[in-house]
Amino acid sequence: MKKNPPKVYLASPFGFSESGRLFYYEKLVPLVVEVGFEVLDPWVLTTDKILKPAIALPYGQKKKDKWQKINKIIGQNNAKAIKNCNLILAVVDGTDVDSGTASEIGYGAALGKAVIGYRSDFRLSSDNEGSTVNLQVEYFIKLNGGIITTNLNELKNILKHHFKKYK
């Protein structure tokens, strides 16, 4: 009987922009899959069938009410995926880490999940010289043995190391 592959939850703001989605689906997701992990992708956990009715509504109270219901579903789906993953890979780019990504890092860390931070952004983002990103975000990344890396080759090697733990 074949064992299910270990799961990585991919926390990132990359789904919000076309260029982000291109990197996410052309580089990052394939890299994780190549190592052997199953990807839990928050950008596809909530289906278009749920999203499209809200998108189609004209601006106003009905649209706002619909989105509030959908937002709860999205949050629940993502929380469930974080609970069910073995590892979190969090993209921590930007002048400040995306608030949703930071929340997913903290939630996963509280559940005892290891978190790998990936930062391809060369801009400074830390609170002081002792951290790479916000000190609290970095604390939660490192809490359960995680690390922040800044290049894809190193990320691949880190993922391989973690894969051995879970297979």
Regions found by a protein language model. Name each.
Residues 1-167:
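Conserved catalytic or regulatory cores that recognize and/or transform ribose-phosphate-containing ligands
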